[in-house]
Design a protein with these regions (language model features):
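Conserved alpha-helical scaffold segments that buttress catalytic/binding sites
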Residues: 2-6, 14-308
Length: 308
């Protein structure tokens, strides 16, 4: 299947074994939103080219639509593709990103954003905060992205979580896979009370449980370069695909949004990292559906009893 037109709904037929969005209010719509910008990248450009590459992998005949839990987009939940935002490396780009997230949340959809570099997480979370208040964040990355202003740029892709924490958009930040924690960022960790699971200490059990509302941000350079060569910043000694999937599978808290960022197609090998990003989209979307909305625990429990 080719990439969908803007606001195309991928599949709306009911599943015989699991309630649909219309009849239960639990299986929801996930809205894909491309944020093709890398203006705040500090080393290499390229992530702006990623959203259509991720879509091509997602809809490719190389795989199918199922997540590992058994839920399939187009069968068990609706996947809307809002296309790529018309970003122009101008001051208004953050406002365009925020407006798109506002629109998704207002429509009852859960936004799943395709970067782009990691700087996009800040405007995304500004809109998430307006709808859900301060969130808990699971941030998977090689880098803490807590610089006050890398190279004098406070909007650098190395600084989004400093802006997020300063603005009070998160009540808790848990960072997993970190392996580049220098003196400045150690001070920022202490300042903001960040919970860090460094790569050298990683096990799935080391990742704490989360409460709703939860936002998940996955920087593909959190993976070992052997799993994700298509990133700008290779940092050896990282997470495997299975380790990250195990972390996601343990999450029970309702998820109000997510992003997958920092794919650089210019560095990828045979589409390996694009396929990884596409798999993460399927796994995140299915986890959003299975964990249900923030405010309907009883309904969610009944519906999930009928799902795989």
């Amino acid at each position: 299947m080719g990439a969908c037109a803007p606001l195309d709904t991928v599949g709306n037929e009911p599943d015989n074994g699991c309630s649909t969005a219309e009849d239960s209010g639990v299986v929801r719509t996930i809205r894909l939103i491309g944020a093709p910008t890398d203006i705040n990248s500090s080393f290499l450009r390229g992530p702006a080219k990623a959203p259509p590459v991720i879509r091509a992998a997602l809809y490719s005949d190389m795989g199918n639509r199922a997540a590992e839990c058994g839920l399939e987009f187009g069968r068990d939940y609706l996947l809307e593709d809002a296309g790529d935002l018309p970003l122009s490396e101008a001051a208004g780009d953050d406002e365009r990103i925020t407006a798109a997230i506002h629109a998704a949340c207002s429509a009852g959809a859960v936004p799943l954003v395709l970067g782009g570099d990691h700087a996009i997480s800040y405007p995304v979370l500004q809109a998430i905060h307006a709808h859900h208040g301060a969130v808990e964040i699971l941030h998977i990355d090689a880098h803490p992205d807590l610089y006050h202003a890398l190279d004098g740029n406070p909007r650098s892709h190395a600084s989004p979580f400093a802006r997020i924490m300063e603005a009070g958009l998160a009540r808790r930040l848990v960072q997993v896979g970190i392996r580049t924690l220098n003196a400045e960022q150690r001070a920022q960790v202490a300042r903001f009370g960040v919970e860090v699971v460094p790569m050298r200490d990683f096990t799935p059990d080391a990742v704490p449980p989360f409460a709703a509302p939860l936002y998940i941000s996955i920087d593909l350079d959190g993976f070992d370069p052997a799993c994700a060569p298509g990133v700008s910043h290779h940092e050896p000694g990282g997470l495997t695909t299975r380790q990250v999937l195990d972390v996601l599978a343990r999450i029970a808290a309702p998820i109000v949004g997510a992003d997958v960022v920092e794919l650089n197609p210019l560095r990828d090998l045979n589409g390996m990292t694009a396929m990884l990003a596409a798999k993460l989209v399927k796994e995140l979307a299915a986890r959003m559906v299975r964990n249900g909305p923030v405010a309907a625990p009883d309904t969610r429990k009944r519906a999930m009893a009928n799902c795989p």
